[in-house]
UniProtKB/Swiss-Prot annotation:
This is CCA-adding enzyme. It comes from the Bacteria. It catalyses: a tRNA precursor + 2 CTP + ATP = a tRNA with a 3' CCA end + 3 diphosphate; a tRNA with a 3' CCA end + 2 CTP + ATP = a tRNA with a 3' CCACCA end + 3 diphosphate. GO terms for biological process: RNA repair; tRNA 3'-terminal CCA addition. Its EC number is 2.7.7.72. Catalyzes the addition and repair of the essential 3'-terminal CCA sequence in tRNAs without using a nucleic acid template. Adds these three nucleotides in the order of C, C, and A to the tRNA nucleotide-73, using CTP and ATP as substrates and producing inorganic pyrophosphate. tRNA 3'-terminal CCA addition is required both for tRNA processing and repair. Also involved in tRNA surveillance by mediating tandem CCA addition to generate a CCACCA at the 3' terminus of unstable tRNAs. While stable tRNAs receive only 3'-terminal CCA, unstable tRNAs are marked with CCACCA and rapidly degraded. CDD domains: NT_ClassII-CCAase (cd05398). The gene is cca. It comes from Streptococcus pyogenes serotype M2 (strain MGAS10270). ATP binds at residues 32, 35, 116, 159, 162, 165, 168. Belongs to the tRNA nucleotidyltransferase/poly(A) polymerase family. Bacterial CCA-adding enzyme type 3 subfamily. Mg(2+) binds at residues 45, 47. A single active site specifically recognizes both ATP and CTP and is responsible for their addition. Keywords: ATP-binding, Magnesium, Metal-binding, Nucleotide-binding, Nucleotidyltransferase, RNA repair, RNA-binding, Transferase, tRNA processing. CTP binds at residues 32, 35, 116, 159, 162, 165, 168.
Length: 402
């Protein structure tokens, strides 16, 4: 198969391939970018594979950076762009089902492609637009099928994260997993416990943000892979609820909303501990935990002005999106009205602060000062007090007198 027109991302990188070939080596576009252009999808990263060894690659170009030279990768800075160029390689026995004990550089494109995970990711493209397909990836691409390169069992024993990648590709590409590949994923799912939580989180996160995320979750359920992921053991019922409880065309607006609804579906009682088990950042934990709290408030009643002040309009909108996807009542106009009615959106918007209370009223730093500031803040939010210096002073004077 030959591309009639090279996409602009590849055209810009063609001089790189030309230089390498002029130096006497082979060079091809490889991986996800080739797959995506054949599917008519946007291209993100342009990866280049070559028969030149790293030191040979560095000798061809003036500006290079060793970003992963032990694995054969050199970053080339050329024509205003950055390109990762990786030497054809084979990989020895894998350690702990996640990393090769040794990487060997080779001159053969086919040897390089056979170590890749799925046939649709094992395609290469030359400078003339000719697709090199050694493992029937084009047929799988046409039939929207995800199939492991070579023996599926070996691919997943080499790197068990490929199981999670399989779920993610099913979700992002809307592909079905080929039967033999699926069975190997199912039988090797226990190996996911060997994978770093951070790597599993990245794949699960991408799955949740994919347009066909239900397909990825369904495959995970069918493989019983969830039993080997943090906080998901024996959570088949919760994961099924996650799939069926939202409208078919619903996709998550952002990562916070996605993980919040996962925990809502699983009825997780301690969201922070759940997210800690996934080794997420403290900021992520705080935001998602607040989002779940606001969701539960909304399940009980309509939003009030104080809710919008404390949680924010954006977070309230994420909650309403989830309610709409469940065919529950929503009222974005009410949220907008409450937000517009807020005199302040943050305590720093208040014209008077703790320093003023210390200076003008002789208050001392401590709990009493903090409590007074909270009273001022609440009174302004609820509309009982104007955000005016003189008015606030009078309010404080009255509070201190009682």
């Amino acid at each position: 198969m030959k591309l009639m027109t090279m996409p602009s991302e590849f055209q810009k990188a063609l001089p790189i391939l030309t230089k390498i070939k002029e130096a006497g080596y082979e060079a091809y576009f490889v991986g996800g970018s080739v797959r995506d252009v054949l599917l008519g999808r946007p291209i993100h990263d342009v990866d280049i594979a070559t028969s030149s060894y790293p030191e040979e690659t560095k000798a061809i170009f003036n500006r290079t950076v060793d970003v992963g030279i032990e694995h054969g990768t050199v970053l080339v800075l050329e024509n205003g762009g950055e390109y990762e160029i990786t030497t054809f390689r084979t990989e020895d026995v894998y350690v702990d089902y996640r990393r090769p004990s040794q990487v060997s550089f080779v001159r053969s494109l086919e040897e390089d492609l056979k170590r890749r995970d799925f046939t649709v990711n094992a395609l290469a493209l030359d400078e003339n637009g000719q697709v090199i397909d050694k493992f029937r990836g084009l047929i799988d691409l046409k039939q929207k099928r995800l199939r492991a390169v070579g023996k599926a069992e070996e691919r997943f024993e080499e790197d068990a994260l490929r199981i999670m990648r399989g779920f993610r590709f099913a979700a992002s590409l809307d592909f079905d997993i080929e039967a033999t590949t699926f069975e190997a994923m199912r039988s090797h799912s226990p190996l996911l416990e060997k994978i770093s939580v951070e790597r599993s989180f990245t794949e699960f996160d991408k799955l949740l943000m994919a347009p066909h995320w239900r397909k990825g979750i369904s495959a995970m359920i069918a493989c019983q892979a969830y039993d080997y992921l943090p906080g998901l053991k024996q959570q088949e019922a919760g994961l099924n609820h996650l799939i069926v409880s939202l409208k078919d065309n619903f996709t998550f607006s952002d990562h916070h909303q996605a993980w919040a609804y996962v925990m809502i579906s699983l009825a997780i009682e301690d969201p922070k501990s759940f997210l800690k088990a996934w080794k997420t950042s403290n900021d992520f934990q705080r935001y998602v935990t607040k989002l779940i709290a606001l969701y539960r408030i909304r399940q009980e009643r309509s939003f009030e002005k104080l809710d919008i002040y404390q949680y924010g309009k954006k977070m309230a909108s994420l909650v309403e999106d989830l309610r709409k996807a469940q065919s529950l009542s929503v009222d974005m106009d009410h949220i907008n009205t409450l937000d517009q009615a807020l005199v302040i959106h943050d305590k720093h918007d208040i014209v008077l602060n703790g320093s003023h209370l210390i200076k003008d009223f002789g208050m001392k730093p401590g709990p009493q000062l903090g409590l007074m500031l909270e009273k001022v803040e609440l009174a302004i939010v609820e509309g009982r007090l104007d955000n005016d210096f003189t008015t606030i002073e009078a309010f404080v004077r009255e509070e201190l007198a009682t």
